[in-house]
Design a protein with these regions (language model features):
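Polybasic, glycine- and aromatic-enriched phosphate-binding surface used to engage nucleic acids
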Residues: 1-133, 140-154
């Protein structure tokens, strides 16, 4: 999966990368290179002229099935996985947060670089778990409004 496959919020097959869709895996490579569980993917590098720095996409179960049950993610893609099963921060909420104009503006304040590092993603202040639990019940439109309001109030 290439970074170009992530624009638009959902992974897709960018035609420009079709000729490069091959990789030779050696024994043991699957432990580190193959992604076979849902995750949130974020482009790791952007061009200065791009209007956004944070370009997330949710790799959910149905998307994984569409891609054959597993993908190899190239090095210009950050892979964000849920490490605390009880966390109220779902993939849907994380994608909505990262796709918001508010977080994109905040991220630009944290860094002047066009690169999106895992370290800087981890530094983004997130709402309290109780807020996330409330947001989980909202439809996409209301969720986007709540995210904008929340971060506007924080500044």
């Amino acid at each position: 999966m290439w970074a170009a496959d992530l624009d638009g919020g959902k992974p897709h097959r960018a035609r420009a990368r079709e000729a490069q869709r091959w990789v030779h895996l050696r024994p043991g490579d699957d432990r580190t290179l193959v992604l076979d569980h849902p995750a949130v993917l974020v482009q790791r590098t952007t061009a200065p002229e791009q209007p956004r720095r944070l370009l997330p996409a949710e790799l959910d179960e149905s998307c994984l099935e569409e891609w054959g049950g597993q993908v190899v993610v190239e090095n210009h893609v950050n892979v964000l996985r849920k490490v605390e099963p009880e966390s109220p921060l779902t993939a849907r909420l994380l994608v909505a947060l990262l796709a918001s104009d508010a977080l994109d503006r905040l991220y630009r304040c944290l860094t002047g670089s066009v690169a999106v590092s895992a370290y800087e993603l981890a530094a983004i202040p997130l709402p309290e778990p109780s807020t996330l639990l409330t947001w989980a019940n909202y439809d996409d439109t209301r969720l986007a409004q709540e995210i904008e309001s929340y971060y506007r109030a924080q500044t």
